[in-house]
A protein has these predicted regions:
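Conserved alpha/beta-domain cores
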Residues: 1-178
Length: 178
């Protein structure tokens, strides 16, 4: 049903991308691509296939997910944090332990971002983290994130922070390789 809806929209609008949520296994991504292609929805410059990185298996298997030929990855930091830490962010007793800056979470973010950046795959992050923790946003930029989503009240602040970090990165000498 969802694929039929996407096809119908594509008849009139050619700037539609598809983002697949909660992809647990590489085979699920392969099967999803097969189903889309069987319905005539093939990747092209105006039809991109993205996946959400929201579950720990995405972290461990990011290279394999990239190898399926996806065009982009959007990290769902709220769900990924919740599932890595085993904390229900809506549970009042546990909410204070929900923290995207936890080392396990930041290592996961770094792994996904660096893998995507090294293979030329667009990588973004959605969730509250970039709006709440500027120090985390700086790390995301250093690791090679392509874009971040923030709450409307943080757009200007985050834009300036990213510009500052990118300026520092562009003036930092890079090690020479043989």
């Amino acid at each position: 049903l969802e694929i039929e809806a996407v096809k119908k929209v594509r008849e009139s609008y050619h700037n539609l991308y598809v983002m697949i949520p909660f992809v647990r296994t590489v085979n699920e991504m392969i099967e999803t691509k097969r189903l889309l292609e069987a319905e005539g929805l093939r990747q092209s410059p105006d039809f991109k296939l993205w996946m959400m990185a929201e579950v720990p298996s995405n972290v461990f298997l990011i290279d394999e997910f990239i190898a399926t030929g996806i065009d982009g990855v959007s990290i769902g930091s709220n769900d990924l944090t919740q599932l890595i830490l085993g904390i229900d962010r809506d549970n009042q007793k546990l909410a204070e332990k929900f923290d995207e800056r936890n080392e396990a979470v930041t290592r996961a973010l770094e792994r996904i971002i660096k893998a995507c950046a090294s293979k030329g795959v667009t990588v973004s992050i959605c969730g509250q983290a970039p709006s709440v923790y500027p120090e985390l946003t700086e790390k995301l930029v250093r690791w090679g994130i392509t874009s971040v989503s923030v709450s409307p009240d943080m757009i200007d602040t985050t834009r300036q922070l990213i510009a500052d970090v990118e300026a520092r990165l562009s003036t930092t000498p890079r090690p020479r390789t043989a």
